[in-house]
């Protein structure tokens, strides 16, 4: 047995010959770890480590997947949610403007963390925000992926958000300051918790760690609906401000300390390695293979080309099937674009005849008898 000097509490490490096991005990001689003769290890508590899989509730946190725009710089739609990189959408309703892109070089290629990042660039400034004006990056975590946190019950669990961020601009004062991240119940938005963090210097990656306590009340989505929505504010809504570090019973986006990142043209923000995990400890970022990350993203959005050929006798229709690579979260909104190399009529199918979570079936009119071939690009959107 052993204890600290002046502390009566003791722990012990013993070898039990009868059971042929090494036993580790802590305060009060409670058994915590046992190594049996067959090599099996039994622990009485949870194993906490930096390399177990399945920790991260965020999809595409390392910003590798960008099905919609690739690395093309894209202006954020005003007054509308706009998906850029997979699973991440942005909202911008200020009097200024900003662009977003996936970057794989420069700051993103530093020796800190992943080699990709999401970059926000202010292209037109708004120096005085009012009402709900904001610039926000968001991901909605599907209920299946967060319902085990038991939000809305007495057993609600804490979760920890970690990410790496870098800001730069014409001068440090343009971007340094206090920023906010909020958590809210998707769809209802009547529970919200705000956390603050600071950007202290420009041109330096900073890892931020924020712990959110479990919310024991309110309605939180489960199953394939939206559960927890997380928002990163680069400019915050003045009419939706609230105190940090407490659960609110109405929607709050940021605190009164929130920096207006839209205030100066050519402010840049880079963010990557976003992770959300159960508990109060931020472990190292969980890297998944590109194929696995892409498949996770395709549950919510997928685009691909389909082609085929069919003989039509008379003015009839050609059936066009789209079999998804990954089963969708829900029946998707599907758009189709006819490739110019085909010989079908029109630029998109006449109608979608079947729409399921595993695929869709449309038909396209033909001009008359003959062989018809088609090349279609479809986009299936089942985002939250």
Q: Predicted segments — roles?
A:
Residues 1, 13, 22-24, 28, ...:
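Low-complexity, small-hydrophobic/phenylalanine-enriched stretches
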Residues 40-384:
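Extracellular and organelle-lumenal recognition/adhesion modules and their flexible linkers in secreted
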Residues 8-10, 30-32, 190-192, 205:
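Short, mixed charged/polar active-site loops
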Residues 1-29, 94, 100-105:
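Self-maturation zones of extracellular/virion spikes and adhesins
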């Amino acid at each position: 047995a052993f204890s600290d000097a002046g502390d009566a509490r003791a722990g012990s490490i013993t070898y039990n010959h009868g059971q042929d096991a090494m036993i580790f005990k802590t305060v009060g001689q409670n058994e915590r770890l046992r190594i049996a003769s067959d090599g099996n290890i039994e622990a009485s508590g949870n194993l906490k480590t930096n390399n177990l899989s399945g920790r991260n509730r965020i999809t595409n946190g390392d910003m590798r997947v960008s099905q919609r725009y690739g690395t093309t710089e894209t202006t954020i739609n005003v007054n509308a949610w706009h998906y850029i990189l997979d699973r991440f959408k942005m909202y911008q309703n200020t009097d200024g403007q900003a662009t977003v892109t996936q970057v794989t070089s420069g700051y993103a290629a530093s020796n800190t963390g992943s080699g990709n990042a999401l970059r926000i660039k202010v292209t037109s400034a708004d120096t005085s925000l009012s009402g709900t004006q904001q610039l926000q990056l968001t991901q909605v975590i599907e209920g299946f992926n967060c319902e085990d946190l038991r939000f809305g019950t007495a057993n609600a669990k804490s979760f920890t958000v970690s990410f790496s961020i870098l800001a730069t601009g014409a001068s440090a004062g343009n971007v340094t300051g206090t920023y906010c991240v909020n958590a809210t119940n998707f769809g209802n938005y009547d529970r919200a918790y705000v956390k603050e963090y600071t950007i202290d210097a420009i041109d330096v990656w900073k890892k931020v760690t924020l712990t959110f306590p479990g919310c024991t009340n309110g309605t939180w989505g489960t199953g394939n609906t939206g559960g927890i929505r997380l928002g990163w504010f680069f400019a915050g809504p003045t009419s939706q401000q609230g105190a940090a570090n407490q659960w609110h019973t109405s929607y709050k986006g940021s605190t009164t300390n929130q920096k207006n990142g839209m205030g100066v043209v050519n402010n840049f923000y880079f963010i990557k390695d976003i992770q959300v995990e159960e508990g109060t400890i931020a472990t190292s970022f969980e890297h998944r293979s590109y194929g696995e990350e892409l498949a996770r993203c395709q549950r919510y959005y997928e685009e691909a080309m389909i082609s085929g050929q069919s003989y039509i006798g008379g003015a009839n229709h050609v059936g066009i099937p789209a079999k998804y690579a990954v089963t969708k979260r829900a029946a998707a909104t599907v758009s189709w674009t006819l490739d110019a190399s085909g010989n079908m009529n029109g630029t998109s199918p006449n109608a979608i005849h079947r729409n399921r979570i595993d695929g869709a079936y449309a038909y396209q009119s033909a001009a008359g008898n003959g062989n018809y071939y088609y090349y279609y690009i479809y986009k299936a959107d089942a985002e939250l």
